[in-house]
Regions:
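Arg/Lys-rich, positively charged N-terminal/basic patches that mediate binding to nucleic acids
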Residues: 1-34
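Short, hydrophobic secondary-structure boundary micro-motifs
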Residues: 30, 52-54, 94
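Short proline/glycine- and basic residue-enriched helix-capping loop/turn segments at helix->loop/beta transitions
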Residues: 42-46
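Basic/aromatic recognition patch in beta-strand/loop cores that engages polyanionic ligands
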Residues: 49-78
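Enriched for short, Lys/Arg-rich terminal
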Residues: 69-70, 74-97
């Protein structure tokens, strides 16, 4: 498997997704949802070209759906750098520096 790097913003996104899902739907769903999120991240590390290029967001970025969220990442030597994990209804441009 390729390496996985999460930016601090992406880690904060994971934490927020966990907290929201726990509060809204309970522990079991929070565990299930975040486990699937991590499985998708691991799949992308193994097969980084699965995601669709999204240069309109930022040059070099790719995106991949995971449940109601979109994983935004870029390729790095030996793996992927997960930049953000945003809800599909969010205005993506607002969340990138």
């Amino acid at each position: 498997m390729g390496g996985i790097v999460l930016t601090p913003a992406a880690q904060a996104d994971v934490d927020e997704i966990w907290d929201y899902t726990l509060e809204r739907w309970g522990l079991e769903q929070a565990e299930t949802y975040t486990r699937q999120l991590w499985k998708n991240i691991e799949t992308l590390a193994e097969h980084p070209s699965l995601g669709k290029e999204c240069s309109e967001v930022r040059p070099g970025y790719r995106q991949y759906p995971s449940g109601s969220h979109i994983l935004f990442y870029r390729l790095i030597p030996n793996g992927i750098d997960v930049v953000r994990i945003l809800h599909e209804r969010m205005d993506y441009q607002r969340h990138f520096p």
